[in-house]
Amino acid sequence: MKNTVIRGTAASNQIRVFVANTTEMVAKAQELQMATPVAIAALGRTLTATSMMGLMSKSEKEKITVNINGGGPLGPIVVVGNSKGIVKGYVSHPHVEGSNLYPGKLDVGSAVGTDGTITVVKDLGLKEPYIGTYPLSTGEIAEDFAAYFAFSEQQPSGIALGVLVDVDYTIKAAGGYIIQVLPNIEEETLTKLESKLSTLEPITSIIDRIQDPEEILNHILGEFEPVILETYDVDFVCDCSEERLEQVLISIGEKELTEIIEEDKQAELVCHFCNKKYHFDEEHLNKLRSEILNKNNNI
């Protein structure tokens, strides 16, 4: 139940909603990235949002890449997701220490920064992917996704994302929701929804107390008679492999690869997403260089 997203509707199909509990997923990301509280708060929020966005896809082949770069000390945050809600991601500087806005509330906005953009790339496997970019509004992630949806996709959305880090730096709760109003929404329903969302306690408090996404949905939208359409198991999964890293080395070209062989006689590559190390000895590098030369000779 700790890595679950539910998709549903409410108010007789006037509202679309996604609710996520991603506590274990964010804990896994924290362990892989060895991230500080403020770093995992920023990354965890982005992972949760991207997972829910992936589940909005109408194509099973769609891949989503979210890049948040606000010019802050954390550096760019990159998350990649698919149509099943499976994600992987990293924060460029995971060891940055942050400050609190007030006791118990991390200042994620200052760590992310606001001098930059949120960019969403949706790759459907066609010739050109869809790319949407919008200036960051607060760096707090949820508001930035809401602004992206409103202006890049013309979809008004209420979004809450959160990561609750315990005193021992473990992840106590993580998750969020995306609530979107559909074109047929009545003014009275919209006013009632806005009022409800404005009075909710922080999403991490709700998840820490309730945990089950179905119960969270009823807590948030119970008066709108929500209907659950589907439940998804989501996760942080890195699909890196030696073969993929071989392609990275091949892509640098014969000249640079030869320089590495002559100067270092080995190479070590580290996956950004899971920090797994791949070691290539001189024999392996020479084999890759031969592949490049053979390919060039056949052109």
Swiss-Prot record:
GO MF term (any one): unfolded protein binding
GO biological process terms on file = protein refolding
> Primary place of residence?
cytoplasm
Q: Any keyword Lipid metabolism?
A: no
What is the annotated localization of this protein? Cytoplasm
Instruction: List each coiled-coil range.
Output: none
InterPro entries attached to this UniProt entry? Heat_shock_Hsp33 (IPR000397), Heat_shock_Hsp33_C (IPR016154), Heat_shock_Hsp33_N (IPR016153)
Keywords, in A-Z order: Chaperone, Cytoplasm, Disulfide bond, Redox-active center, Zinc
A single GO CC term for this protein reads: cytoplasm
Q: List the disulfide bonds.
A: 238-240, 271-274
Q: How is it modified after translation?
A: Under oxidizing conditions two disulfide bonds are formed involving the reactive cysteines. Under reducing conditions zinc is bound to the reactive cysteines and the protein is inactive.
The job of this chain, per UniProt, is described as: Redox regulated molecular chaperone. Protects both thermally unfolding and oxidatively damaged proteins from irreversible aggregation. Plays an important role in the bacterial defense system toward oxidative stress.
Family listed: Belongs to the HSP33 family.
The protein, known as: 33 kDa chaperonin
Native source organism of the sequence: Alkaliphilus oremlandii (strain OhILAs) (Clostridium oremlandii (strain OhILAs))
Q: What is the lineage of its organism?
A: Bacteria, Bacillati, Bacillota, Clostridia, Peptostreptococcales
State the encoding gene.
Answer: hslO
